[in-house]
């Protein structure tokens, strides 16, 4: 009886050549290709056909975009999770959902192996394998990029040509692109040279901010307990909401970043990330929290958010700490309900209004006018006590 290998399949260069490679290097195996649709723009029927044409014995193409949004993206929005203060974790958030689907199919098919096309230098190999280990440690992983003779994307293209596999990558334009509903990342090629300004042709969604619409646009986002529900007054499904914000953000050049990041595996890498809708959501959520969370909760949440983002980036979605932080984040969102109005213009997002019944901001107290709850004279006593440690230190130092 043939062994079964479940392959994380995208239809791209790497995973397309893995199918014939597996059949050449492992005897009596069936390759079962699994593509989890997390909102990438590829035509799923084409991906299905390509998997079979490349030699897969069976292919699954499942739409998991709703789960992607509700189970990972919206949790990240509540936490305002970022990696190294900039990256909105587009690839990192998708991997645990895809890996979970791989494990489910492996169980269904009775497969002992899962194979992925992640390179030996990247973070994704860790993300996939950490999820697989957490969900079923008995499953064995095959990682071709760590063992085969193919050493570069140029080599991979040559292999594809020899096996009559059609791919979109060329040696002239060697970008590596990862796309889903939340973002598009572009790496490789001339981007790898730090002295190069990235070219406009790297953009897959957004217009360059310089070329964006000359007319500003206002957008309203309604949140209920930290979860986005409406855009411009229209209630939308989670997936449709992200699509709508992407559409609005793209034409204004929102959410384009060019960063050098520290990979989990120890090296630095440079990438161009486009997260138009996500950037609008993060900014709107941040604005709403600034008005509805007390200082101590907000400041502590910001500290914890950094760790939360790091855990996601490192592939530890299914660790106990991430789940525990989620419980805290959920508590912080009780009063994060209301509408935020923002202004989009040439890559920028500006606050344009906060509408909530839960604001801790009180105009009467915050203004320079009189207030029954606050007497200006009270500040003197507060300052005396607040600065007491500084005074004592200065007195001791003066001896």
From Swiss-Prot:
Catalysis performed (reactions): L-citrulline + L-aspartate + ATP = 2-(N(omega)-L-arginino)succinate + AMP + diphosphate + H(+)
Domain of life from the UniProt record: Bacteria
Enzyme class: ligase
Main location per the UniProt record: cytoplasm
Chain positions recorded as ATP binding sites: 8-16, 117
Chain positions recorded as L-citrulline binding sites: 87, 92, 123, 127, 176, 185, 261, 273
A GO cellular component annotation in the UniProt record: cytoplasm
Listed GO biological process terms: argininosuccinate metabolic process; L-arginine biosynthetic process; urea cycle
PANTHER family documented for this protein: ARGININOSUCCINATE SYNTHASE
Similarity comment text for this entry: Belongs to the argininosuccinate synthase family. Type 1 subfamily.
Name of the protein in its database record: Argininosuccinate synthase
Taxonomic lineage of the native organism: Bacteria, Bacillati, Bacillota, Clostridia, Peptostreptococcales
């Amino acid at each position: 009886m043939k062994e079964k290998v479940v392959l994380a399949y995208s239809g791209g260069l790497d995973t397309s050549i893995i199918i014939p490679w597996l059949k050449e290097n492992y005897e009596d195996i069936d390759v079962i290709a699994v593509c989890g649709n997390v909102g990438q723009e590829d035509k799923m029927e084409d991906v299905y056909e390509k998997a079979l044409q490349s030699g897969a014995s069976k292919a699954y193409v499942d739409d998991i975009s709703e789960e992607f949004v509700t189970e990972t993206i919206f949790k990240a929005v509540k936490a305002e999770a970022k990696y190294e203060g900039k990256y909105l974790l587009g690839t990192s958030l998708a991997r645990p959902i895809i890996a979970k689907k791989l494990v489910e199919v492996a169980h269904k098919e009775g497969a002992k192996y899962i194979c992925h096309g992640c390179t030996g230098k990247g973070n994704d190999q860790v993300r996939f394998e950490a999820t697989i280990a957490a969900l079923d440690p008995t499953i064995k992983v095959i990682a071709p990029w760590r063992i085969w003779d193919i050493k570069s994307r140029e080599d991979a293209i040559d292999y594809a040509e020899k096996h009559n596999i059609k791919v979109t990558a060329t040696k002239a334009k060697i970008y590596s692109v990862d796309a889903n509903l939340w973002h598009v990342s572009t790496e490789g090629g001339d981007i790898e040279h730090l002295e190069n300004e990235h070219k406009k042709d790297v953009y897959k969604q957004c217009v360059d901010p310089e070329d964006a619409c000359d007319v500003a646009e206002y957008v309203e986002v309604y949140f209920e307990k930290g979860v986005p529900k409406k855009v411009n007054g229209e209630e939308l499904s989670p997936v449709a909401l992200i699509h709508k914000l992407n559409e609005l953000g793209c034409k204004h050049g929102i959410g384009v970043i060019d960063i050098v990041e520290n990979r989990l595996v120890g090296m630095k890498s440079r990438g161009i990330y486009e997260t138009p809708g996500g950037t609008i959501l993060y900014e709107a959520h941040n604005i709403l929290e600034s008005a509805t969370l007390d200082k101590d909760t907000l400041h502590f949440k910001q500290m914890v958010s950094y760790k939360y983002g790091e855990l996601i980036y490192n592939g530890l979605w299914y660790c106990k700490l991430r789940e525990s932080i989620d419980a805290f984040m959920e508590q912080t969102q009780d009063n994060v309900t209301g509408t935020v109005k923002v202004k989009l213009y040439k890559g920028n997002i500006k606050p344009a209004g906060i509408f909530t019944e839960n604001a801790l901001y009180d105009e009467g107290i915050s203004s320079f006018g009189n207030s029954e709850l606050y007497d200006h004279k009270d500040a003197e006593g507060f300052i005396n006590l607040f600065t007491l440690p500084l005074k004592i230190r200065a007195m001791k130092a003066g001896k």
